[in-house]
Every structure is written in structure tokens, then in C-alpha cells.
Amino acid sequence: IQGLYNLALDTDDNDPVRSIYKNTFKKMYKRYKENGNDSLFYDAPLLMIVVGDMSLGGSAYVDGGLAASNMELMAYSQGLGICYNGFFVMASNVEPKIKELLGMSENEAVITSFILGYPDVKYKRTVNRNTAKFEMR
């Protein structure tokens, strides 16, 4: 996590999108240094990053999303929890240094990312729901 925070703090302020992420990262980093509060990855033991090869066409986003969805279902079936991290996706796609740190090529893009681990909270039951009514035509 230290390396990602350092990359964010080294970015150029001339780009308005980068500057938004830089300011947010500064706040996150300050909290992390002051009290160990990791508000980017929440101290999860694993960060999954789904990467797509954009030179193969626009279907990389669909394929990557479907793959992530299947990973999510498998994780839940094993008693694990996930939390998607769109902030990391956006930051990695505007900051080339993050892609470099991850060993990604120019043709690759981060499709999605999520943290994975055992949830702190377990629910014994869910909210009561009405039976779904639908008709196929």
C-alpha cells in the first residue's frame, strides 16, 4: 500500500482528474499514517485486479466484468467477502506509474478490482422478501 500512496503523491497537478485523485489520496495517506486506517484496501489480505487486453477490442470490459462476477460468486460460496474498488480502477487508468508498478503493457487496462477476505460480520438471516413474480413471453 505504501508504494501506491507514494505514486499518487508524486503525480502532476496539471491534470484535473489526477489532481482529484491526488488530493483524495493525500487525505487517505494522512489517515493511514496517523492511525493505520487503510481506507483504500481496508487491510484486506488480497487485492484482485482484473486486467484486459484492449488491443483485442472493446469486449475486454464485458469479459473482465463477467470474470469478476464469477470470482465474486465463487468467493461467497467459500465464505469469503469482496468489496469492489472503483477508486483504484480510476486511479490506475489515469496514472501510468501504477500500471508500470503492476507490470502492465500499454495495451492493457484495469477493468475492475476488488478486495477479498473473510468478512468481519456474519448475518444469520437476510431481510424477508416477497416472492418474485414474473412472466415470460
Q: Predicted segment positions?
A:
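Low-complexity, flexible helical/coil segments
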Residues: S19, L80-V89, G117-K124
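Small-aliphatic-rich amphipathic alpha-helix that forms the alpha element of a beta-alpha
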Residues: L46-E100
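C-terminal helix-cap and adjacent tail motif
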Residues: M104-R137
